[in-house]
Amino acid sequence: HPLRADTIMIGFSERSSPAAIDNLTRLVFANTAITNIIIVVMPKENTAIHLDMIFTQVDRELCVVYPPHFVGPERLTILHWKKGQSQVREMPNVFAALQSLGLPMEPVFCGGDRRNLQEREQWASGCNFVAMRPGLVLSYARNDATLREMEKMGFRIVSSTGFLTGEARIADDERAVITFEGGELVRGGGGPRCMTC
């Protein structure tokens, strides 16, 4: 996830290795303007094999997260690797790591405040958004609790049909979520952002 011109966030899952992360960071530092890499040590769960299944930035200072992995006693290990330093530094949480880099980020909880809805909607790619621009994202229509949380943060929910037919216009500076049906895609295990690659 590119967060800023000098900062990216990556997930370290069971599909990667310490050597792969080491090689990736060295290549990134040597060949790009990136100076900070935030590493999220992913859980060994089928529903969280990619970072965008538990974290997606949806606006400059706003991200959708699966709360158990980022807030409270079950939160994941977060590491910060700064260019020029030989070792990574463990951070208290992802928000402290980002704040230390001048990137304050406010979370939107996937599934809202109820754990059962968080689990259900995370499984259905509730954290997985495609950012078209800061504040304009695409999402499945099925994750009602997450979409309600987005509305609380000032996002207007617009159906893809309404958007494509011109019934719903979105201003250049407006926060909006364009939703689309994707029941079969969810059953196949893919989220909207996953399918953009």
Predicted regions span which residues?
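The feature marks the mature, well-folded catalytic cores of soluble enzymes
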Residues: 1-197
